[in-house]
Swiss-Prot record:
Organism lineage string: Eukaryota, Viridiplantae, Streptophyta, Embryophyta, Tracheophyta
Annotated transmembrane regions: 9-29, 64-84, 88-108
Catalytic activity from the UniProt record: a plastoquinone + NADH + (n+1) H(+)(in) = a plastoquinol + NAD(+) + n H(+)(out); a plastoquinone + NADPH + (n+1) H(+)(in) = a plastoquinol + NADP(+) + n H(+)(out)
Subcellular location(s) per record: Plastid, Chloroplast thylakoid membrane
First-listed, main subcellular location of the protein, grouped into a coarse class: plastid
Organism: Fagopyrum esculentum subsp. ancestrale (Wild buckwheat)
Keyword Plastid: yes
Protein name stated in the entry: NAD(P)H-quinone oxidoreductase subunit 3, chloroplastic
GO biological process, one term: photosynthesis, light reaction
Membrane topology of the entry: Multi-pass membrane protein
A single GO molecular function term of this UniProt record: NADH dehydrogenase (ubiquinone) activity
Cysteine pairs bridged by disulfides in the record: none
InterPro entries referenced in this protein's UniProt entry, alphabetically: NAD(P)H_OxRDtase_bac/plastid, NADH_UbQ/plastoQ_OxRdtase_su3, NDAH_ubi_oxred_su3_sf
Main function: NDH shuttles electrons from NAD(P)H:plastoquinone, via FMN and iron-sulfur (Fe-S) centers, to quinones in the photosynthetic chain and possibly in a chloroplast respiratory chain. The immediate electron acceptor for the enzyme in this species is believed to be plastoquinone. Couples the redox reaction to proton translocation, and thus conserves the redox energy in a proton gradient.
GO cellular component: chloroplast thylakoid membrane; NADH dehydrogenase complex
Length: 120
């Protein structure tokens, strides 16, 4: 039989972690002064007055490099729990993780061949 009371702490944590940001957002909207001064609308660059145009275009290679990084960073998030419980899960989960890693290696080779990892 599935017992829901075992998850009471989870639901309480989920509720509290959802309510706190919503309350903070609402309170900041209520308490913050609403002014449209030119100083408020100007861009802020680490305490230095902005020189020139603040909007710059980034080259697509930075985007591709960041995208490849995010993909392999998420891979680590998925593989860590598997590695921690490897001895309990058995051979079938090992084969599934191996297929997952092989798919990611194929993606890495594809990104490498397309030049997503090159800076020049």
């Amino acid at each position: 039989m599935f017992l829901l009371y075992e998850y009471d702490i989870f639901w309480a944590f989920l509720l509290i972690s959802s309510v706190i940001p919503i309350l903070a957002f609402l309170l900041s909207g209520i308490l913050a002064p609403i002014r449209k001064d030119p100083e408020k609308l100007s861009s802020y660059e680490s305490g230095i007055e902005p020189i020139g145009d603040a909007w710059l275009q980034f080259r697509i290679r930075y985007y591709m490099f960041a995208l490849v990084f995010v993909v392999f960073d998420v891979e680590t998030v998925f593989l860590y729990p598997w590695a921690m419980s490897f001895d309990v899960l058995g051979v079938s989960v090992f084969i599934e993780a191996l297929i997952f890693v092989l798919i990611l290696i194929v993606g890495l080779v594809y990104a490498w061949r397309k030049g997503a990892l090159e800076w020049s």
